[in-house]
């Protein structure tokens, strides 16, 4: 379900009366002969360069001053499950597909549908098997209000951006470290004779964890009464980036 903020955003996008880098307007749902266009649009939106959710807003007539074309009884209308099945049946590289859903929004002059393409870090999303003119191995994206043509691939700078996004290289250091902490097996011990234990992230060794026991604090406090361990231990843990500590 669309949040109130999303609904306000959709209304604002419609009021702009132009398409953009993460939203597109369609007068009606894609008919059978235009299913390749649907897939192509979804891939382009999933690889958008804004690093955010994207929208295909269906039921807005661009040629009629962006008026609402009511979708209540529209032909070829799809539910979320139908759209998910459509995407699932296409062969994507690595089996990694865009996440999509269909939301309905009631406006004063009629009903519109919104295909929401969720933001994800598995970019670039690429077909490994062509589908009716949508080419395998082509990387499609969207720049301003234009999709990459089906017979072409994105520019190298755009492809580089999408791979950087996948590897979390677009994140600030403090955002990156929380992602790295999920990968316990990628942290290595630092040999040290001191009482402080150190580990570094092997693919970005500027990130270091330091922790040491606080023997003088060992013991129960009121919020540990439900714990089974009869001898709780306390540690000071620091996350270090190079030498400064962004968070203790």
Region spans (language model):
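Short C-terminal domain-edge/linker segments immediately following a structured domain
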Residues: 54-57, 87-92, 145-150
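Surface-exposed flexible segments
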Residues: 66-77, 127-139, 240
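Intrinsically disordered, low-complexity boundary segments flanking structured domains
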Residues: 6-15, 85-90, 101-103, 128
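Intrinsically disordered, low-complexity regulatory tails
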Residues: 94-179
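Bergerat-fold GHKL/Histidine-kinase-like ATPase
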Residues: 1-67, 75-81, 150-243, 247
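A broadly used, surface-exposed interaction patch
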Residues: 62-103
């Amino acid at each position: 379900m669309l949040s109130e903020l999303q609904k306000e955003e959709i209304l604002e996008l419609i009021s702009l009366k132009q398409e953009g880098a993460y939203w597109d307007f369609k007068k009606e749902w894609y008919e059978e002969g235009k299913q390749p266009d649907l897939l192509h649009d979804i891939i382009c939106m999933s690889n958008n360069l804004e690093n955010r959710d994207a929208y295909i807003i269906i039921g807005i007539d661009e040629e009629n001053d962006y008026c609402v074309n009511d979708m209540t009884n529209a032909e070829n209308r799809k539910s979320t499950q139908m759209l998910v099945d459509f995407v699932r049946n296409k062969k994507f590289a690595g089996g990694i597909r865009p996440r999509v859903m269909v939301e309905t929004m009631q406006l004063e002059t009629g009903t519109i549908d919104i295909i929401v393409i969720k933001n994800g870090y598995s970019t670039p999303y690429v077909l490994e098997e062509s589908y009716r003119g949508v080419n395998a191995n082509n990387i499609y994206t969207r720049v301003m209000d234009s999709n990459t043509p089906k017979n072409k691939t994105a520019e190298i700078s755009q492809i580089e951006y999408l791979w950087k996004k996948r590897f979390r290289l677009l994140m600030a250091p403090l955002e990156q470290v929380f992602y790295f902490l999920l990968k316990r097996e990628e942290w290595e011990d630092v040999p040290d004779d001191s009482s402080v234990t150190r580990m570094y992230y092997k693919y970005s060794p500027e990130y270091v964890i330091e922790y040491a026991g606080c023997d003088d604090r060992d013991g129960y406090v009121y919020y540990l009464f439900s714990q089974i361990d009869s001898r709780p231990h306390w540690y000071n843990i620091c996350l270090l980036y190079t030498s400064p500590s962004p968070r203790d």
